[in-house]
Amino acid sequence: MMKTFMKKILLLLGSAAVFCAGMPFQVLAAEAGSEAAGAVPLALCIPFAGLLLCIAVLPLVKAEWWEKHQIHAVVLWSLLFIVPFAVRYGSGTALETVLECLVGDYLTFIVLLFGLFCVSGNIGMEGDLAGSPRINVGLLMLGTCLSSWIGTTGASMLMVRPVIKMNYWRRRKSHIMIFFIFLISNIGGCLSPIGDPPLLMGFMRGVPFFWSLHLMPVMALNVAVLLFVFYWLDRRAYRKDIAEGCKPDISKPGTEIRILGLHNLIFLVMIVAAVILSGVLPGMVAFQNEAGQVRGIRLYGEVKLSYPALIEIAMILFAAWLSFKTTNSEIRRKNHFTWGAIQEVAVLFIGIFITMQPALMILKAKGAELGITEPYQMFWVTGALSSFLDNTPTYLVFLTTAGSLGFSSGIATTLGQVPVAMLEAISCGAVFMGANTYIGNAPNFMVKSISDENGICMPSFFGYMLWSLIFLVPVFLMDMLVFFL
């Protein structure tokens, strides 16, 4: 199964590379790259919108076809961006743009997901487990607290299977996983640079490591409100399940709750350490050349795989390998572990990363011209764009914009002085509003896929957005009124 999956990924990469290699190099990559960054036509964003529509609509109308042909849809929409882009700016620029997003962003993204998916799949629980409203609130609170210290992806992968297992007997449980995404996969990651990649980028640009603790009041209010709403919803669903005869199987008295594969926490710490190193090593002299640039393996043009990224990838893959070598396969069987979820995410997100490049180029070129000067504006614009685009470059665009506004006080970053309220708004917008869609943050789609695999009927792409519109947007309005006006 994994061999077939790798062949499909290579098909996509090969299609792009062969096309770019076969075209005449109309312009020098460096020159065309600067032109592309400043004048990308809006029409080149159509493939990104088309791919999102496929993800949203096809599982509803052609589920079996979509499951078999996801890779072909990804190849189609990717080429519909790459071909016109190469014709307009030259195949050199097209190849460099695609390689930059794949090597600079997608590779570390998918390796991190893969490592956490493998390690968490080797950690299990057994015993008399029965999900009740109070227990579920406790689980969500625990996962939310973990998110800032092992990352939203790490906490999501660690907690998703125990939460599913405790609620296996429930008939109404999709709301549990939706609030899981709201809290553990997103909002909980705002208190440290480890929590979410945008904050790690902020740390690399001079924001103090523990500055994110300033976001504690905003996070506490959001978590308190959402947990209160969740408890009310879950209590109603729980009572209906009980009334309809749903009961947990606790027929084995004396069975203690046990955590299986506990040694895998060591490998989880290895992965977290790899992420931290990826943010620290680029600032060390040993990893910089004479010009102050991060050293790496040059692949093509200005594209290179940096040594810190290479170390991160090696550490994560080694941790995943150790996890599988040292854990009994029976634990994975009890966890209903399959490769389906990571394969789906890997295929879809390679297309998302490629096709969203024009939108990111336009944002980088025009972001400073939007006239955004107030914290509440930063909060909403950063958040709205982070719901659909990669929240890390979105965060950097608006951090750069804030640093260029000429403030004389605030947090001293390498991009300029940024007022505390402005930085709080940008950080909260990028981290919190990743919860608005399945593609807003890395773990969202993973949680959905694992839930689907385990028989939980998760809402469609637009169905999930309706949930976020009803439950998250009012909370974000409250954030604006209390903290950012």
Model feature map: region roles:
Residues 32-44, 65-72, 94-107, 209-218, ...:
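Interfacial loop-to-helix junctions that mark the boundaries of transmembrane helices
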